Amino acid sequence: MKTLPLLLLLLLDLGQAQGTLDRVPLRRQPSLRKKLRAQGQLSEFWKAHKVDMVQYTETCTMEQSANEPLINYLDMEYFGTISIGSPPQNFTVIFDTVSSNLWVPSVYCTSPACQMHPQFRPSQSNTYSEVGTPFSIAYGTGSLTGIIGADQVSVQGLTVVGQQFGESVKEPGQTFVNAEFDGILGLGYPSLAAGGVTPVFDNMMAQNLVSLPMFSVYMSSNPEGGSGSELTFGGYDSSHFSGSLNWVPVTKQGYWQIALDEIQVGGSPMFCPEGCQAIVDTGTSLITGPSDKIIQLQAAIGATPMDGEYAVECENLNIMPDVTFVINGVPYTLSATAYTLPDFVDGMQFCGSGFQGLDIQPPAGPLWILGDVFIRQFYSVFDRGSNRVGLAPAVP
């Protein structure tokens, strides 16, 4: 007698999860690293930023959103469009789960990066209101600074009113100059927000714009435009994954932080024998970990230094070991084709390693970061209502 009500509840839950969904298309474009490599300027980029990606790893405290590792954005390939103001002013952004602020270039910004991207013009918006609070986010080459304003923000038909956002007036370094994106929309917890700003997704929930307090990410592995890649607000789409979601509790609210049981290479445990912490991050393209562990991992997969970065012999992909992250008792296995980044340089195939050293200091770290290399293989659901992350094998 209890079977029917239970079935109805399951169907209701499934309907909510897949019913009223607001989809934001994500387009895939060549990363800044690929563009610099193709232009023969990558080594000059490392020198200009005083970074040796083989011998040095960027150190980050990550105690708040006001400190971001700049290298995270070098390999970003997935971007979406938002609009701010009325009439709308469009911007290309990274949807980033490891930060919580929204910022775009201001018309008052004189940095070279701002001149290369659309700039927000408050005088041209009928719904803009000045807040005037200064904000600052520290990056590897300096601080991005600006002021906070408020306006309506639209994301694929979802319009948040009174959203506070950063108008950058200074953007550091060359990374933002050549980037495909104009700004960043953070999807982390409110505790990460610089200036005490309420994040966009929190306002979506508060203004009843989403049917469920969750969003999900599907990143297509198709290198040509990433057709089908999308960020979904209000639930998840089961057509993008196989099997069922493995729900993993968030261990610390701020980042989307979860526990790793262990990390295996070639089927044998290699790291985190007693467990460790990781964050699922749409704003980091690679998989990062403590530099001493990553050096061991690069050696285990056969990656060697080449022009300031780690690469493998492309013809060895079929004999390279799998790398498995065991999460909540479930193995998530990446084959060599999944954790390497193919490219062509001067007509020759190049296979870069998808792993990068990044030392995150206590009390936030050490942390592993499961970026796009991981998310491409595993559909990811971020559930604020139950403070958990859902993972399942992505459908190619």
Swiss-Prot record:
The set of disulfide-linked cysteines is: 109-114, 272-276, 314-351
Record PTM: Glycosylated. The nature of the carbohydrate chain varies between cell types.
Name the GO terms of the biological process aspect.
antigen processing and presentation of exogenous peptide antigen via MHC class II; proteolysis
Residues annotated as signal peptide: 1-19
Q: Which UniProt keywords apply?
A: Aspartyl protease, Autocatalytic cleavage, Disulfide bond, Endosome, Glycoprotein, Hydrolase, Protease, Signal, Zymogen
Reported EC number(s) for this entry are 3.4.23.34
Q: Give the CC-aspect GO terms.
A: endosome
Say yes or no: keyword Protease present.
yes
**Where is this chain's protein located in or outside the cell?**
Endosome
All copies of the Peptidase A1 domain together span: 78-392
Q: What is this protein called?
A: Cathepsin E
Lineage of producing organism: Eukaryota, Metazoa, Chordata, Craniata, Vertebrata
Q: Which gene encodes it?
A: CTSE
